[in-house]
Amino acid sequence: MESIGVVAPHTMHFAEPLRLQSGSVLGNYQLVVETYGELNAARSNAVLVCHALNASHHVAGVYADDPRSTGWWDNMVGPGKPLDTNRFFVIGVNNLGSCFGSTGPMSIDPATGTPYGARFPVVTVEDWVHAQARVADAFGIERFAAVMGGSLGGMQALAWSLLYPERVAHCIDIASTPKLSAQNIAFNEVARSAILSDPDFHGGDYYAHGVKPRRGLRVARMIGHITYLSDDDMAEKFGRALRRADGALDAYNFNFDVEFEVESYLRYQGDKFADYFDANTYLLITRALDYFDPAKAFNGDLSAALAHTKAKYLIASFMTDWRFAPARSREIVKALLDNRRSVSYAEIDAPHGHDAFLLDDARYHNLVRAYYERIAEEVGA
């Protein structure tokens, strides 16, 4: 299947203040957006794709000045792909607090003339959804054919169906959860602690010091990356293989340099992440993950929380995902069935753990493709 080709982001400016769940207010702010495909005359074929922790608005295609800059879900979105841009108008939005162009900690605070840094307010999944709704308004989209996301993106899709039930026809929620477990909050806390304890963090105002808490970011990414892979996948990729420059495969160095292939891989991932991601953004997004819990306002009753939803749902999980295990997706399915909602559920046997939602698995892609065929018939796409 062909790629969507060269794409370009554009920036949308919003003058109407946005009141956040914390009570803070953002005045003027901007969101970076990419679109793919054509919006039909009825404006009925729009699909919003919500991104996860370290992703962005750049869902598909490549940038003209960097042919290696493939979008993070390019295998899913494009001409003839499961989310077919020959039929649907797809929008990717970079969320508030991110470090890829939307207003966030790296942006200039108009009150001080310096980057917000640690002064940028805490944002939630619900705040992101309200900001995304303003993007939809700007495009004249009253109702999305679908809102789709994986992991944290799936939480946003679910939140859309709760906050704007009249504006979502279908909610596609993949490898996600209705709330983080204590274990998941603990992983986030350890990752944040690595950043906060880095001497180069400077209380979040490291921009003024001309440094970056790279050590903390590296460790945070290494911790997170372990949780994205399955035990079987790591065993197959690395096992106990040694990494030796001299080619010796069975001798230990008896020191604390990189010894095993898996160590080398994690350090590489950590270094790469520290090159492009912002530490304050990492803190904000992991806290947004922690806070997401739509059942909290209903005494922990997810069925009650979902009682006023009107969308149809596709919920999918992966059997080897232990970060957001299938049992968490089944909680959502049960709550929807308790409310007699239309829900399709698939539990996919893929070996790649949580990151399977990003990969090109035939069974997974066929499932999504078939579901979008159904949506296309409904909207005449």
UniProtKB/Swiss-Prot annotation:
**Keyword Methyltransferase found:** no
For this chain, the annotated S-S bridges are: none
Pathway annotation: Amino-acid biosynthesis; L-methionine biosynthesis via de novo pathway; O-succinyl-L-homoserine from L-homoserine: step 1/1
List the subcellular locations.
Cytoplasm
Which terms does the UniProt entry file under GO BP?
homoserine metabolic process; methionine biosynthetic process
The catalytic activity of this protein is classed by the Enzyme Commission as 2.3.1.46
Q: Which SUPFAM superfamilies match?
A: alpha/beta-Hydrolases
- Does the entry feature the keyword Secreted, yes or no? no
Quaternary structure and interacting proteins, as annotated: Homodimer.
Please describe what this protein does.
Transfers a succinyl group from succinyl-CoA to L-homoserine, forming succinyl-L-homoserine.
User: What HAMAP family does this protein's entry cite?
Assistant: MetX_acyltransf
- Can you say what this protein is called? Homoserine O-succinyltransferase
Which organism does this sequence originate in? Burkholderia mallei (strain ATCC 23344)
